[in-house]
């Protein structure tokens, strides 16, 4: 009998989940417990769900991860003792319930009952009483529980303490607005492939397909959708008419000042948005795109194929010159450097969970190595554009200031059309400015 019971329990745990709430709980639990990236595991989870459950699952995953420090602080008020590590999925299910009650326009009784039913789908029906009691307690006493739970910056702004302190230090006048912008659901920007049609022509097609949008002044190829949609609803997406890319990232191609007959290096290229934009600007140029991750390099290939473009793709660490360089110098080098991603938290809220304070120093060191290794590969009068999607000064203006003091043959090129706010070195856009992502740009000329 004991063996039979164990077999039944194993089957319950291993069966495929077909509803949004327990599916979201498993994804969130994996992010919290195993520090796995949200995008990858969510993509896999959605494939196993019926189409009518996918939207809610995605909304729960992003919402709970975005507000995790706040929701966790509330959950701590509801539980007499923490759940065990092996029950991270139950912890996540409770957070899903709280998120529905706090932020989603769902009937409360349905949100509560369906969340409680998720315990059985997770193979843990014994937890129904615990989840039910916790959520009902919150329903009854929300105001007093919130007052206790939200009495500190970590819970109020839903960011880890170390990151709040760093942003306060770097941006003492605007740190609160930055944190608030990080918690806003991001808009959806498009980049029109002008090798196929003009921006105005594509805008007309969007409107004809009941997808209202508007031009973005900061980039000549950029459109902003009124409401985000599935990419496969975009006219001729599969045949390369358009790509999804934040307008802040779209400004990079203009800063490179691309001309015909140039040899261009995109040193940290995946997933390929900037590589493709460079080629759309001048398809005949020789573009070498590197990435250390072969799976991510495959993403670049998929994007260039969809857009009908060609780049030379190499799996390599850009800093390991001997492993990939053929000895010919470049006219343009783009270092879209690995960084904390602190400027794009609104798009990747799991950054709050996955990043650690120690990451900053290691990333700054890697950025410095890339600058030092790749700079000698640039032709005289060539341009090196250094970008990050970070807002931390160590990774941005301080990094470039340090580089310029060490290299007399390097000068910063002041841009006639500033892509963002001028800093001591480079240009910084903070998250949410003009509804764009946080981004840093510096353009260096080899004298």
Predicted regions and their residues:
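S-adenosylmethionine
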Residues: 2-447
């Amino acid at each position: 009998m004991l063996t039979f019971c164990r077999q039944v329990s194993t089957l319950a745990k291993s069966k495929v989940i077909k509803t949004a709430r327990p599916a979201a709980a498993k994804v969130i639990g994996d992010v919290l417990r195993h520090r796995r990236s949200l995008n990858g595991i969510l993509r896999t989870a959605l494939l196993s769900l019926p189409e009518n459950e996918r939207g809610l699952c995605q909304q729960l995953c992003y919402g709970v991860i975005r507000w995790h420090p706040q929701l966790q602080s509330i959950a701590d008020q509801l539980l007499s003792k923490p759940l065990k590590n092996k029950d991270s999925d139950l912890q996540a299910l409770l957070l899903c319930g709280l998120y529905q009650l706090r932020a989603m326009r769902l009937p409360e009784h349905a949100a509560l009952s369906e969340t409680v039913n998720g315990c059985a789908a997770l193979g843990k029906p014994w937890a129904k009483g615990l989840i039910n009691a916790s959520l009902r307690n919150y329903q009854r006493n929300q105001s007093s529980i919130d007052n206790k739970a939200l009495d500190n910056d970590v819970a109020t702004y839903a960011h880890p303490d170390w990151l709040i302190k760093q942003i306060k230090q770097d941006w003492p006048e605007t740190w609160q607005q930055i944190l608030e912008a990080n918690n806003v659901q991001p808009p959806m920007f498009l980049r029109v492939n002008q090798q196929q049609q003009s921006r105005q022509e594509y805008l007309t097609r969007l409107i004809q397909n009941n997808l209202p949008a508007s031009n973005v002044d900061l980039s000549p190829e950029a459109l902003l959708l009124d409401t985000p949609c599935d990419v496969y609803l975009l006219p001729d997406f599969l045949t390369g008419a358009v790509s999804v890319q934040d307008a802040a990232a779209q400004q990079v191609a203009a800063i490179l000042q691309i001309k015909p007959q140039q040899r261009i290096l995109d040193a940290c290229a995946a997933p390929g948005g900037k590589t493709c934009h460079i080629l759309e600007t001048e398809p005949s140029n020789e573009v070498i795109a590197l990435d250390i991750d072969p799976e991510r390099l495959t993403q670049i290939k998929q994007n260039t194929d969809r857009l009908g473009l060609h780049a030379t793709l190499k799996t390599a660490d850009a800093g390991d010159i001997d492993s990939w360089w053929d000895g010919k110098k470049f006219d343009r080098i783009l270092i879209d450097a690995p960084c904390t991603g602190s400027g794009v938290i609104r798009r990747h809220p799991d950054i709050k969970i996955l990043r650690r304070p120690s990451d900053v120093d290691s990333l700054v060191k890697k950025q410095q190595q890339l600058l030092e290794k790749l700079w000698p590969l640039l032709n005289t009068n060539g341009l090196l554009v250094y970008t990050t999607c970070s807002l931390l000064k160590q990774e941005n203006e301080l990094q470039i200031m340090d580089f310029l003091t060490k290299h007399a043959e390097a000068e910063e090129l002041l841009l006639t059309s500033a892509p963002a706010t001028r800093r001591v070195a480079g240009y910084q856009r903070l998250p949410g400015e003009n509804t764009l992502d946080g981004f840093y740009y510096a353009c260096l000329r080899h004298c």
